[in-house]
Amino acid sequence: MTTTEPRTEQEILDRESMDDVDAIAAFNPDPDEVLHAVQDQADALFTWDYSKGSRPRLDKLYEKAKVSQWNAQTDLDWSIEVDPLQAFSIFTESSNVGTGHWTEHPDSPAKNWGDKEWDQFSIESFAWRLSQFKHGEQGALLCTAKIVETVPWIDAKYYAATQVVDEARHVEVFEKYIDEKIGVRYPVNPHLQLLLDDIINDSRWDMTYLGMQIMVEGLALAAFGLMHQVTTCLLYTSPSPRDLAV
């Protein structure tokens, strides 16, 4: 079975210091890139043990997933009108929500911004965050597909297959929302891409699973929850647990 040797922080980050400001501020050099290849170091495993239910907890999750399917195109109310300026304009000159450190430096371009500039920044910032959610969900889609290939138990393969479909819906919903309601999209952040690459590149299925659940889904859930609290968009704040789920 293929194995991956642990890498140093310098190798993972591709820089000598974790505090390298220029590297931290890196941007995507090719925003028009359509395809991005990552080496998958893992072996695809067949199992000839088809004993369904040998792992009851996974079997229970699999059965639950089969009856909880939904359609991103028809189960959400896409007729709801969204005004990005009203729904997501939380950074304003008067509210000063989280903007103090951006305006204190004398050379900051935001120092003399008024509400017009903060409104535009809010929309762009929200579009950037939604775009990163979408890219992260595609990362989770690839991770779950890899888990189907690499996990050794049939119950785990069954359940992971339902997660592949679920992550595909998440990507679909975010893209539809961005395309139809916001109209502004951003390429993947290079640091998020680095994280996704490293998770997918690892040969160990359990590390792929942990990386997906803790680093990708966990961070996304926290950020998504914060955005859920500050927006007034009815589609975005729908109470259904299936709506725009991460």
Name every feature range the model reports, one short phrase each.
Residues 171-228:
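Active-site-adjacent scaffolding segments
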Residues 144-145, 161, 221-226:
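A structural feature that tracks compact, well-ordered secondary-structure segments
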Residues 1-145, 149-157, 180-187, 203, ...:
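Terminal targeting/low-complexity segments that flank the catalytic cores of oxidoreductases
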Residues 236-243:
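Conserved small/polar residues in nucleotide/adenosyl-binding loops
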Residues 228-235:
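Acidic interhelical loop/turn segments
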Residues 132, 136, 140, 152, ...:
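Short, contiguous, pocket-lining structural segments
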Residues 153, 158-183:
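Carboxylate/His-rich catalytic cores and anion/metal-binding grooves
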